[in-house]
Amino acid sequence: MGIADEADRTLFVGNLDPQVTEEVIFELFLQAGPLIKVKIPKDNEGKSKLFAFVNFKHEVSVPYALNLLNGIRLHGRQLNIKFKTGSSHINQEGKSPANSQNPSPANTPGHRGGRTPEQMGSPSYSPPQHMQRPFSSPDTLQRQAMMNNMWQVQMQQLQMLSGTFQQGMQQLRGNADGGWSGHRGQRHSPQDNNNHQGRDQRHGNGANNYERNRRDGQRGDFYHHDDRSGGHNRNYPPDRRRDSREGRWKHF
């Protein structure tokens, strides 16, 4: 693998913020394709310079990363991405901006073609701890929670309505069965009442006959006792005593 091949797989990234690290650049450019390494050069005092070199595993990732990420903002600074000096992509028409052979940040012109990040279609990039990843906003999470709560309430209401409907159907079915059973049980009630009334009437007539005979017998005994007593207590005329005796003999 020669130097030219490595240059074809490398991008120059300028106008970096001093807070940007090699790890941040690595994770940022990883979305364009697999990487081999990221290098931020240092000056004689050991301070990081404001540009970096990104080395991709595949050459096809280089122009794709340039079109995808050139002009985005990182820590408030707009990145200036170019092909590295010596890259064959520079000589290809429409692949490299003017004066791209000089990688020095001091001579770096604006981003390619003067296109803004909005024209490139790439969002701004600000990482948490140096990198930011996509996440759901609080409003989105709140709406999702409200939708979930509404769905749960609707399901509970449907379950309650279903249980009430089933209970009502069971009660209606039980009332219908009970009414039919009671109707069947009362079908012979008029005849039974007539039978009871007939029996009560017969018993009542027998009791009346018995009571009448008993009173007649007591009345005859009374007259008989009065006649034997000699009439000391009461004086009855002879005709009445005779009638009493005749009634007594007739009774017996």
From Swiss-Prot:
* Biased segments, Basic and acidic residues type: 211-230, 237-252
A single GO CC term for this protein reads:
nucleoplasm
Compositional bias ranges of the Polar residues kind: 88-107, 119-137
**Disordered, as annotated region:** 88-137, 171-252
The protein's matches in InterPro entries, at most eight in alphabetical order, are given as: NEXT_complex_subunit, Nucleotide-bd_a/b_plait_sf, RBD_domain_sf, RBM7_RRM, RRM_dom
Compartment(s) of residence: Nucleus, Nucleoplasm; Nucleus
CDD domains in the cross-refs: RRM_RBM7 (cd12592)
The molecular function terms in GO held by this entry are: RNA binding; single-stranded RNA binding
Disulfides per UniProt:
none
Give me any GO biological process, just one.
Answer: regulation of alternative mRNA splicing, via spliceosome
Which residues does the UniProt record annotate as the domain RRM? 9-86
Knockout-associated phenotype: Morpholino knockdown of rbm7 causes several degrees of the severity in the phenotype. Mildly affected fish are unable to swim away normally upon touch stimulation. The body shape is slightly shorter and sporadically brain edema could be observed. The moderately affected fish have a curved body shape, smaller head and eyes. Heart and brain edema are frequently observed. In fish with severe phenotype the body shape is completely altered, the tail is absent, and the head and eyes are smaller.
Cite the entry's keywords alphabetically. Answer: Nucleus, RNA-binding
Any one Pfam family here would be RRM_1
Quaternary data? Component of the nuclear exosome targeting (NEXT) complex composed of MTREX, ZCCHC8, and RBM7 that directs a subset of non-coding short-lived RNAs for exosomal degradation.
Task: State the protein's purpose.
Answer: RNA-binding subunit of the trimeric nuclear exosome targeting (NEXT) complex, a complex that functions as an RNA exosome cofactor that directs a subset of non-coding short-lived RNAs for exosomal degradation. NEXT is involved in surveillance and turnover of aberrant transcripts and non-coding RNAs. Binds preferentially polyuridine sequences and associates with newly synthesized RNAs, including pre-mRNAs and short-lived exosome substrates such as promoter upstream transcripts (PROMPTs), enhancer RNAs (eRNAs), and 3'-extended products from small nuclear RNAs (snRNAs).
Domain comment as written in the entry: The RRM domain mediates RNA binding; the RNA must have four nucleotides for efficient binding. Mediates the interaction of NEXT complex with promoter upstream transcripts (PROMPTs) and potentially aberrant forms of other non coding RNAs, such as snRNAs. The RRM domain exhibits specificity for polyuridine sequences.
| Protein name, UniProt field | RNA-binding protein 7
* Protein encoded by which gene: rbm7
